[in-house]
């Protein structure tokens, strides 16, 4: 993929587009080849070889997100059957750790990109709105990974979280309007003050998800 001293134009373009350094891109390219067994693309089943995802309660959603055309910036809806290395880098860039030298404008843009990715994980039907049922589905999946919580406790936590999310967004709803769900603008309000910048990242070599996205 090139060396740090003589960076090919292709590598430079990828670095500018994704924010990764050339060394990080080379590292991710090695991981990409491990996943696809030296093919040119990755399919969903290739993620079955990642041990750290095996017991993640939202594993299916994480894998789905890699093929979501919204996250790939290719279309407003739909799934890709396979992704190439540039697509893989695009998705991994959402998990890129915060840089200490980011100014306020870049940090805000960085935060919005991460939250847009997370929003798409909730918005399963691509309509730009997270319904309360979609919100509950994700929470149910997340909390299913805790064997110490009883079913009634899970339901109470989910309902409470949904009510909190809805109440944060319903102030702008008129008396004759029906609350349909959470838009991305609402989602930004719900997540205001939550440190998504440092929580949502992935270890490059193992692709172990560090994010606690709920």
UniProtKB/Swiss-Prot annotation:
Tissue specificity comment: Expressed in the bipotential gonad by E4.5 and expressed in both the testis and ovary by E5.5, but with expression higher in the testis. Expressed in the testis cords but also at low levels in the interstitium. In the ovary, expression is principally in the ovarian cortex, but also in the medulla. Also expressed in the embryonic brain, with expression highest in the region between the nasal placode and olfactory bulb. Also expressed in the embryonic heart and tail.
UniProt source species: Gallus gallus
Annotated domain remarks: Binds calcium via its EF-hands. Calcium-binding mediates a conformational change. Can also bind magnesium.
An example Gene Ontology CC term for this record: ruffle
Residue ranges of every copy of the EF-hand domain listed in the record: 110-145
Subunit structure: Monomer. Homodimer.
Family membership: Belongs to the calcineurin regulatory subunit family. CHP subfamily.
Name recorded for this polypeptide: Calcineurin B homologous protein 3
